[in-house]
């Protein structure tokens, strides 16, 4: 409503009819697509892309139950499914569908879209792929389900329990399902715009947000080979298309999968991954940078070697990556490393969450900040203004009281 410019009008109309926006917000279910750091960042990316009018979309999976809903019974935590998909949801079913092959079986995908409205600008899309054969009935009152039945469970839960091999293997299936669909959608859109695929980098850029989508690199190479492009050129093309965002300073926390998992789930990718590893070994002496090592496939290593950019998400984080944790890679590719400091969409976290503070900021510096966050620096002019500081504290206290009241109710 804020981005459409009709928030105040809708609020006023509801109040005239004895309703409030807060009541409506409680009725509408929040999409259970990931509310952690990566999910929040992805949502902010898409809002920013739409607001800036850039050509960009998000791609993910249409998780039916998200992570879980936390309830307390007898003073103990209990995890239950968190369903959100209803006929009133913002999901739009499309005609786009692809067969996705795993080791020994194939599933059929279906693309659903959610429109993301920019602030006084364009609308972009969040593409969410689902499987046609998903079966919610295999989930009961808890978050336990048959992890072996991939044809039914693939898109049920975000981050399925990975305390055993079945859960970890399910994550591999999920990751490949996402990137295989995304890669084909990207190639189809590029061809529709006139690309001959040899020039794919002129039509597409793929941002690998942490290592979960890393298999998009070998999958794009595989699909380009299916289109008649030879392996070496396909690798060169993909290396100009893919970029990697790192979110951890601990090298040991970087995602790596047992070769046996990939050979079982996505055997078609292993020859390509082995060839990528061979190319690294042919030009690099440092064994710590190899893609395949000790029976594991190191996803971040593949991203760094065969992507055009590697960024951290804060200045200090990026410096640590360059100087310690990924220093061996930095020595190989100093030109690839750069910093992109994480931000937030202040339209959600300020204008939506705190309209009183937003109104006061506009009163002080005008409304240019709503599209350009740099305008907020003008608030520095009031750093010694007691009246302004008192007003800010009053607003803050009022919002704390609102939060306390909400927490008491829930």
Specify the residue positions occupied by each region the protein language model found:
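A conserved ligand/cofactor-binding region detector
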Residues: 1-410
